[in-house]
């Protein structure tokens, strides 16, 4: 549930080298610029927890990189991001783990705003690409799948 003062990031599993303040600042920036001020909360955790959440809520028994849980009330909702998936994808695509977490967070926020790239004929992909460029992020999730 989103905190009253704004978006928050909880690091359940994170190495000491992870630049937490940068990720927290990015969450606040997303809240302000992309979500029109609506707060959301992000949990950064391990593959096992993402697998459990994916299985419990989507009936898909595998770890995924990001899950979105709309709130239906005040605030946008919650995101869960796999640190393991983020680390692997950052390595694969040649950028930092903080950039990958930011890409995943943007993708998740767009889902919280009601966009669904699986059915919207490219609308979410277009939004993600536009926001990614504006926010200075490397290639986004949808673009990777489409290329």
Curated annotation (Swiss-Prot):
One GO molecular-function entry: zinc ion binding
EC number of this enzyme: 3.1.-.-
Zinc in keyword set: yes
Subcellular locations according to the entry: Cytoplasm
Positions of transmembrane segments: none
Cofactor annotation remark: Binds 1 zinc ion.
Annotated Zn(2+) binding sites: 107, 111, 117
UniProt name for this protein: Endoribonuclease YbeY
Gene: ybeY
